[in-house]
C-alpha cells in the first residue's frame, strides 16, 4: 500500500481525532509556526503592529507594502491584489509566499488566508505541498479545526503528505486534543512521514504542556533514531527539566546541544534564566540573561517582552527600563505584549505610578481593547486595598469600550470577598462565569466564598452561589455540606436537600446526613419555603 493510500485509509481516524498544538504549518517551507518555548510574557494582540511595513519600500510602491499596511481585518487582501493587477503589475507566487510568511509572523492570519485562497483559483499558479500545509494551518486558525480537517480530506492525494500531516498535527496540538495528535503521529510514522524533527517537536510541546514529562526522553530517543534534533527540540527538552526546577538536568541538556554543534538561541537562555531565578541561582541567572541579550534583535522582537519580564524577576529596575528604552528606540509603536510585560514588570518592582503612566500611554495609542493590560492596574489597586480607586478605574475601562474579561471579574470578586461584601462577590462571580464558554473551576475562590457565606449564615447568598455553580456544571457533596452548614449557622431548616442532591447526581456522606438531621429541627423560613 503506498503512502497516499495509507493516509487515505486513516481518514475515519482523522475525522475523529480533532485538534492539537505545536506550530507546524509549512513543515519544510516555513518555520514561522514552529513551536517556540518561552516564559509566559503576556502574548497579546499587539503583534499586528510588530513588523508593520510601509506601502512604499525604498521609494517604490510594492504589493507586499500594500498588503502589510492593511492592518484592519475588514479590509480585503484579494481586493488589494486585484487592484495591483489592474494597474498593470505582475503578481509572482514567490512574492505572495513571502507576504504570507510575513503576515503569519505578525499574526495577521485572515489576510494571509485570503491570499492563499486567491492563489488556489489562479490557473497560472502551481501550488506545492508546502502551500497546502500553510493553507490548512491558516484555516484551522481562522475557521476552526472542523474546516481544517475537511480541507485535508479534500486535498489532492499527492499533497496529503509529510507537510500537510505535520500541519494538521500542529492544529491538533494547539487545540490540546492529545488522542487525535497521537493517532495522527502514529499514522505518520507508518507512512514514513516522520523524516524531520518538526512533528516530534509538536508532540514534545504537547506532552510538556500536559505535564507528561516522562514521555519526553522516550520521544527524543526515537527522534534521534529517525532524524536529528534541532535547537527547538533541545529548548523543549530544557523546558521539561526547568518545569521541575531540575537545574542539573537542564544544564546537561544545554551541554548536549553544544556538543551537537547547535547554537543556543535567545529562547535557550530565556529558559535557563527563568530556571536559575526560580531556584535562587542569581549569579547564573544574570550570566544567562547577558547571553540572551546578545541574541535579541529587531528580527526576534518577541524576545523583548521576555527580556523585560526576566529583568523584573531578578529585581533589576535599571535592566527593565533600559530594555524598554531600547524597544521604544527600535520600533515606531509598542505592541500589547510589550506594554503587558513592561507594566507587569514595574508593578512587580513596586513602581505603581510608573505603571499607571504606561497604561495612560497604552490607552492613547492602542485600539486593541486587550483587557489583560487594564487588568494589571485594576489588580494592583485591589491588592493595595484601594477599592474605590479600583472601582473608578473599572468604570474608566468600560467607558473606553474595553470589554471586561473573565480575569477582570475574578479580580473584582476577590477584592469584594476580602471586604466580605457577598452581594457584590456573587454579582461579579456570576458575570465571570457568564463571560466564558466553559468555566475552569477556581477551587480556592469557591472555597473562600463558601467559607464567608457560612460564617455570615447568609442562606440567601449560599443558595445563589449554589445556583451559579449548578449552571456552571460544578456541584458536589462538599458544596451541599457547605450550604447545610450555612443553614445551620442561620438556625434555619434546609428543605428537600436529599431530593436536590439526587437531581444533581450528588451522593450524601456522613456529614451530609448529620447536617440534614441537625437542620431538620430548626425553623422553616421564607428562603427554605422558596427553595422547596
UniProtKB/Swiss-Prot annotation:
Cross-referenced InterPro entries? Pentatricopeptide_rpt (IPR002885), TPR-like_helical_dom_sf (IPR011990)
Got a GO cellular component term for this one?
Answer: mitochondrion
Q: Which key words are in the record?
A: Mitochondrion, Repeat, Transit peptide
SUPFAM superfamilies registered for this protein in UniProt: TPR-like
| Protein localization | Mitochondrion
Q: Which Pfam families match?
A: PPR (PF01535), PPR_2 (PF13041)
Family assignment? Belongs to the PPR family. P subfamily.
- Keyword Glycoprotein (UniProt): no
Question: Could you tell me what this protein is called?
Answer: Pentatricopeptide repeat-containing protein At4g02820, mitochondrial
Mind listing the GO molecular function terms for this protein? mRNA binding
Annotated region (Disordered), positions in chain: 35-56
- Subcellular location, principal: mitochondrion
Stretches forming PPR repeats: 161-195, 196-226, 230-264, 265-295, 300-330, 335-365, 370-404, 405-435, 442-472, 476-512
Transit peptide, from-to:
1-28
Amino acid at each position: 500500500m503506498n503512502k497516499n493510500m495509507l493516509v487515505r485509509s486513516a481518514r475515519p481516524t482523522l475525522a475523529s481525532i480533532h485538534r492539537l498544538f505545536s506550530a507546524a504549518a509549512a513543515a519544510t517551507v516555513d518555520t514561522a509556526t514552529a513551536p517556540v518555548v518561552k516564559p509566559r510574557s503576556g502574548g497579546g494582540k499587539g503583534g499586528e503592529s510588530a513588523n508593520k511595513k510601509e506601502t512604499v519600500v525604498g521609494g517604490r510602491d510594492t504589493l507586499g507594502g500594500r498588503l502589510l499596511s492593511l492592518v484592519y481585518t475588514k479590509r480585503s487582501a484579494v481586493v488589494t491584489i486585484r487592484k495591483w493587477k489592474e494597474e498593470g503589475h505582475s503578481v509572482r507566487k514567490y512574492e505572495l509566499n513571502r507576504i504570507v510568511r510575513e503576515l503569519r509572523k505578525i499574526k495577521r492570519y485572515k489576510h494571509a488566508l485570503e491570499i492563499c485562497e486567491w492563489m488556489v483559483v489562479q490557473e497560472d499558479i502551481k501550488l506545492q505541498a508546502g502551500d497546502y500545509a500553510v493553507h490548512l494551518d491558516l484555516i484551522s486558525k481562522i475557521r476552526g479545526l472542523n474546516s481544517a480537517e475537511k480541507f485535508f480530506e479534500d486535498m489532492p492525494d499527492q499533497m496529503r503528505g509529510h507537510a500537510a500531516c505535520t500541519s494538521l498535527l500542529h492544529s491538533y496540538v494547539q487545540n490540546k486534543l492529545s488522542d487525535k495528535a497521537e493517532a495522527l503521529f502514529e499514522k505518520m510514522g507508518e507512512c514514513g512521514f516522520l523524516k524531520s524533527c518538526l512533528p516530534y517537536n509538536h508532540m514534545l510541546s504537547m506532552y510538556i504542556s500536559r505535564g507528561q514529562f516522562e514521555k519526553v526522553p522516550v520521544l527524543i530517543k526515537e527522534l534521534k533514531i529517525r532524524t536529528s534534533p534541532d535547537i527547538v527540540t533541545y529548548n523543549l527538552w530544557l523546558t521539561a527539566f526547568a518545569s521541575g526546577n531540575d537545574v542539573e538536568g537542564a544544564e546537561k541538556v544545554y551541554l548536549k546541544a553544544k556538543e551537537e554543534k547547535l547554537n543556543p538561541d535567545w529562547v535557550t537562555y530565556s529558559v535557563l534564566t527563568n530556571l536559575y531565578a526560580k531556584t535562587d541561582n542569581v549569579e547564573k541567572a544574570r550570566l544567562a540573561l547577558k547571553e540572551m541579550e546578545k541574541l535579541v534583535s529587531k528580527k526576534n522582537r518577541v524576545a523583548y517582552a521576555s527580556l523585560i519580564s526576566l529583568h523584573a524577576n531578578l529585581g533589576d529596575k535599571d535592566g527593565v527600563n533600559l530594555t524598554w528604552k531600547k524597544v521604544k528606540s527600535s520600533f515606531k509603536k509598542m505592541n500589547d505584549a510589550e506594554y503587558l510585560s513592561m507594566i507587569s514588570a514595574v508593578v512587580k518592582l513596586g513602581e505603581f505610578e510608573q505603571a499607571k503612566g504606561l497604561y495612560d500611554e497604552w490607552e492613547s495609542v492602542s485600539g486593541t481593547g486587550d483587557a489583560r493590560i487594564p487588568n494589571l492596574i485594576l489588580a494592583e489597586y485591589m491588592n493595595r486595598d484601594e477599592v474605590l480607586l479600583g472601582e473608578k478605574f473599572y468604570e474608566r475601562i468600560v467607558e473606553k469600550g474595553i470589554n471586561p474579561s473573565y480575569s477582570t471579574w475574578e479580580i473584582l470578586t476577590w477584592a469584594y470577598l476580602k471586604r466580605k461584601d457577598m452581594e457584590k462577590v456573587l454579582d461579579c462571580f456570576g458575570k465571570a462565569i457568564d463571560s466564558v464558554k466553559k468555566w475552569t473551576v477556581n477551587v480556592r475562590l469557591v472555597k473562600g466564598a463558601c467559607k464567608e457565606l457560612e460564617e455570615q449564615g447568609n442562606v440567601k447568598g449560599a443558595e445563589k452561589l449554589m445556583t451559579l455553580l449548578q449552571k456552571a456544571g460544578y456541584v458536589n457533596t462538599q458544596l451541599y455540606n457547605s450550604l447545610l452548614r450555612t443553614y445551620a449557622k442561620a438556625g434555619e431548616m434546609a428543605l428537600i436537600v436529599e431530593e436536590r442532591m439526587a437531581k444533581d447526581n450528588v451522593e450524601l456522606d456522613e456529614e451530609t446526613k448529620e447536617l440534614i438531621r441537625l437542620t431538620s429541627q430548626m425553623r422553616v423560613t421564607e428562603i427554605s419555603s422558596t427553595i422547596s
